[in-house]
């Protein structure tokens, strides 16, 4: 199935017999692969003469992206296991601020090892590579990244953009996307090599099934996906430079603007207990601040923690 998707990802029409020959499969095997793609929510068009092509109308535009992001090393992989993993596997070949983009990833992962859903050409699937000195405290980096994403979306006239600590992007109270940050330490160069993964729903197929309320950009605005990638990348680059110079403290005032749960009653689900209180934003380390029911102010670092609105429990 993956080989077939790779072959079709050029956006061109392909004859059935040519696909069989190119992929070295039988007609029956090709039919089964086409059925699997359909079950994954990937729409394939066909004509009576036996031509097949992907229904996705808006594919990644290498020329447009290269022209508008001249300072980034762009690595466009139509079909890939994981954009984060691709960068992590190729650190020695990357320049600072490299960006990996994909139409579809079949082994994408989210926070705490969860699989990241990835319909073909329906999302922004990107990973951003940045080198930080070991002197730079990268605590709370995902929060700074979230604010960069929120500002990019707001600039494109999306309304009700919010952030849920520590790494979710919300739109109209539903999940729009998520952030996953992974790092490798290079002691010889005194560097932290950081890979920032971002997945953002743009235009999802109707048949997609998920276990939580989600939304997509197209429910508010018809924004060109390539333009969206450009804006996200530009805001990310600016935010990462500011973060490197001033740390997370430079972002705290803006965090309150986007914090979905600020001054609201929430429940924190820890490994062995739950704590109820009023969410009070974040501190300079990126820790969540909570005023508990017995008037304690507690702070919680990013880890095995889930945050819920009390109203979600009803």
Give, region by region, the residue ranges found by the protein language model.
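N-terminal lobe of the biotin/lipoate ligase/transferase fold
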Residues: 2-154
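Catalytic beta-strand/loop module used to bind and position nucleotide/cofactor moieties
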Residues: 3, 10, 17, 96, ...
């Amino acid at each position: 199935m993956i080989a077939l998707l790779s072959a079709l990802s050029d956006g061109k029409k392909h004859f059935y017999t040519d696909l069989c020959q190119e992929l070295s499969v039988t007609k029956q095997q090709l039919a089964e692969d086409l059925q699997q793609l359909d079950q994954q929510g990937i729409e394939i068009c066909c004509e009576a003469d036996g031509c097949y092509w992907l229904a996705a109308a808006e594919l990644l535009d290498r020329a447009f992206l290269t022209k508008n992001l001249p300072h980034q090393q762009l690595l466009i992989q139509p079909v890939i296991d994981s954009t984060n993993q691709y960068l992590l596997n190729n650190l020695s070949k990357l320049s600072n601020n490299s960006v990996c983009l994909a139409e579809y990833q079949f082994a994408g992962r989210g926070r705490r090892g969860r699989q990241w859903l990835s319909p073909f050409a329906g999302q922004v699937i990107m990973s951003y590579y940045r080198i930080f000195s070991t002197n730079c405290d990268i605590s709370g980096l995902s929060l700074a990244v979230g604010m960069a994403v929120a500002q990019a979306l707001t600039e494109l006239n999306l309304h009700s953009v919010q952030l849920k600590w520590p790494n979710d992007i919300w739109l109209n109270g539903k999940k729009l996307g998520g952030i996953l940050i992974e790092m490798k330490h290079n002691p010889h160069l005194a560097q932290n090599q950081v890979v920032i993964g971002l997945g953002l729903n743009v235009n999802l197929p109707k048949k997609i099934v998920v276990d939580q309320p989600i939304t997509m950009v197209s429910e508010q605005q018809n924004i060109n996906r390539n333009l969206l990638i450009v804006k996200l990348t530009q805001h990310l680059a600016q935010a990462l430079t500011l973060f490197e110079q001033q740390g997370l403290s430079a972002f705290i005032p803006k965090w309150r603007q986007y914090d979905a749960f600020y001054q609201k009653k929430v429940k924190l689900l820890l490994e062995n207990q739950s704590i109820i209180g009023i969410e009070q934003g974040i501190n300079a380390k990126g820790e969540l601040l909570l005023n508990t029911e017995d008037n304690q102010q507690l702070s919680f670092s990013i880890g095995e923690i889930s945050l819920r609105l009390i109203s979600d429990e009803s």
